[in-house]
Amino acid sequence: MRHRVKTKSFHRKKEQREALFINLAKSLILNGKVETTLPKAKALRSFVEKLVTLAKEDTIHSKRLVAQRLKDQKVAKKLYTEIAPLFKERNGGYTRIYKLENRRIGDGGEKALIEFVEYPS
């Protein structure tokens, strides 16, 4: 029974699941958009939105927390210098998810595109 279990496991252990979201978040920050399955996109949304909210604070402590969670200083720097200032006036809702028409070959998983609402081109 799944009583009081809020997170999806994606059939991975905790460390593997964290690594999955860190890598997807890095790709999203560097490229502005990522194509993945719909459940992963929905889970990634909450992970990334918490990071952007932290980066908006613009304190040394928040910068260290972002770098610690992303495990990459270059990506963290891009997040709090380029992306976070775009969302200074916005209180959440930094990403949008589009459902894609074609399904994944093999298991037929529903594909989605997750992107930042305002991203510099």
Curated annotation (Swiss-Prot):
Keyword Phosphoprotein: no
GO terms classed as biological process: translation
Classification via InterPro entries: Ribosomal_bL17 (IPR000456), Ribosomal_bL17_sf (IPR036373)
UniProt keyword terms in alphabetical order: Ribonucleoprotein, Ribosomal protein
Pfam families reported for this sequence: Ribosomal_L17 (PF01196)
Record-level GO cellular component terms: cytosolic large ribosomal subunit
Molecular-function annotations in GO: structural constituent of ribosome
Transmembrane segments: none
Family from the record: Belongs to the bacterial ribosomal protein bL17 family.
Subunit structure: Part of the 50S ribosomal subunit. Contacts protein L32.
Protein name: Large ribosomal subunit protein bL17
Protein source organism: Sulfurihydrogenibium sp. (strain YO3AOP1)
Gene giving rise to this polypeptide: rplQ
